[in-house]
Design a protein with these regions (language model features):
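N-terminal, polar/charged subdomain of small-to-medium soluble alpha/beta proteins
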Residues: 1-88, 97, 103-150
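Glycine-rich, phosphate-binding/catalytic loops in enzymes
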Residues: 93
Length: 150
């Protein structure tokens, strides 16, 4: 499971020209799911994201987590995070989980991270054509792969 985590002052998801979800200060998390991802990946990644100290404290040092700042969370599924560009110029998405597997893991991830955060994560719509808008704060963008826990 790959997560692209972006600290934002605001973010939103629009589907069919209607805003589905909108947050203020917090994190926008793009999630890519692989076929071999499981509950262990979900639990580890959720805890990591919720407790990542990437918000500034009173001394302007990144020392506070999403929980510490009572921030909001927007989670969007993005299978293209598993693109392979090794051959040719057209990306291959063979490493991404099939939709029937990915949707279950995505929904479980949203449930777990909402519980860990102790507030409901907002979402996009799995498989939909979405317009994602964000105002990156910093900018702070971090990529985490649950298969590479170094």
């Amino acid at each position: 499971m790959i997560a692209v985590i972006q600290r934002v002052t605001s973010a939103s998801v629009t589907i069919d020209q209607k805003i589905k979800s909108k947050i203020g200060r917090g994190l926008l998390v793009l999630i890519g799911i692989q076929p071999d991802d499981d509950k262990n990946d979900i639990d580890w990644l959720s805890r990591k994201i919720v407790n990542l100290r990437i918000f500034n404290d009173e001394e302007n040092v990144m020392n506070k987590s999403l929980k510490d700042v009572d921030g909001e969370l927007l989670v969007v599924s993005q299978f293209t995070l598993h693109a392979s560009t090794k051959k040719g110029n057209r990306p291959s998405y063979i490493a991404a989980a099939k939709p029937e597997i990915a949707i279950l893991l995505y929904e479980e991830f949203v449930t777990v991270i909402s519980s860990d955060l102790e507030k409901q994560a907002l979402t996009g719509e799995f498989g939909a054509d979405m317009k994602v808008e964000l105002l990156n704060d910093g900018p702070v963008t971090i990529i985490i792969d649950s298969k590479n826990k170094k």
